[in-house]
Amino acid sequence: MVENAIALVAHPTSAEIIVNHVKDGLELAKRNRLPTRVRAFIPEHHGTMRVSFLYQKAVESTSNGKVDEAAFRYPGPKPQSKETALLMLADGCEAAVRASRPATPEEVNEIIRKVIADRISWGQLDECPLTMADLEKVRQSFGATLQGMFHPRLIYPDQRDGAIERQRE
């Protein structure tokens, strides 16, 4: 079983599918008459980020390392509100923690710090009113939440065999 069907598609095609889901989402939101403020979340939470994983794979798969970066970039706009910026950060942090499978709270916190720092360095938060104090609160909140969601679980002996013991009434 393939965990991610997009992995079966060529890199530029995969990027097109991923980037176009924003346009498709906006059309769906408009068709369903979602308020403009709600619709803003669809493009803004991706900003003008690059679909980095697929971009890197495409660069590695070419003989000269040249790839049209624009084909791997969301059209934007960058987050314009605290709320859309928070969604961008939450989406990025959750995905990074899920993909990395950290073993310790420190590793979770480091992933969160890196995602936030990356969004800042890439200018994704330049057009929203989040302050550094806000970002520190976000980092702490995400740390507590994601540590609770993705902490390593003990494997109990009866689970190793795939059997789940049912309690009898």
Predicted regions and their residues:
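Long, compositionally biased intrinsically disordered regions
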Residues: 10-13, 90, 100-103, 107-169
